[in-house]
Amino acid sequence: MALLATLLLSAALGALLSFALLAAAVASDYWYILEVADAGGLGGVQLFSHSGLWRTCEGQNSCVPLIDPFASAGLEVSPSVQHLLSLHRTVMVVLPLSLVLIVCGWVCGLLSSLSQSVPLLLATGCYFLLGGALTLAGLSIYISYSHLAFVEAARTYGVTHVQNVHISFGWSLALAWASCASEVLSGALLLAAARLLSLSQRPGVPHSVIL
């Protein structure tokens, strides 16, 4: 049963890695990076800012909180801004919720591993796959939100004011993508472990099949 133990251990480590990566991503401020190039075309950078889920920072310091999308729900704003606020609210709920689900899944995975229960392993594997899908949905919504926010800024201030602006996604988003991949991998490993354990419990299965 060495292979089964390896699968279970790998799944547990993958879940822990997924939690650590997503926690670091959610807490950091390098999701969205904005640079304003020199208007004279010299290639210099006049302004550099980076944003996270909770605040935006100019340079290395001077961070200010982002507008609370929940407190802003009743404001009289345009439909496009209301849509942006709703996307921001969704991201701020989905990604922290994914963290909680990873912890719950890790506990369920530990219990199913100790009990050597095929149904529990299957359920936990599917749980992690669904959790990975939720994280993926949150990341996709954030990317859409960032794009629409830039479009709204261009519409509000004029295209000429944003033509020297360069935007990109930072390492925080990369950590979140890695967390999503690790979570899905953990789910796949648990499903493989459930399959292996199911085969080993069948009567008449040669011992070499389960080693």
Swiss-Prot record:
Transmembrane segments: 91-111, 118-138, 173-193
Record's signal peptide: 1-28
Compartments it resides in: Membrane; Endoplasmic reticulum
Matches recorded under InterPro entries: PMP22/EMP/MP20/Claudin, TMEM114/TMEM235
Keyword Secreted set for record: no
Gene Ontology CC entries for this record: apical plasma membrane; cytoplasm; endoplasmic reticulum
Name listed for the protein in its UniProt record: Transmembrane protein 235
Organism: Mus musculus (Mouse)
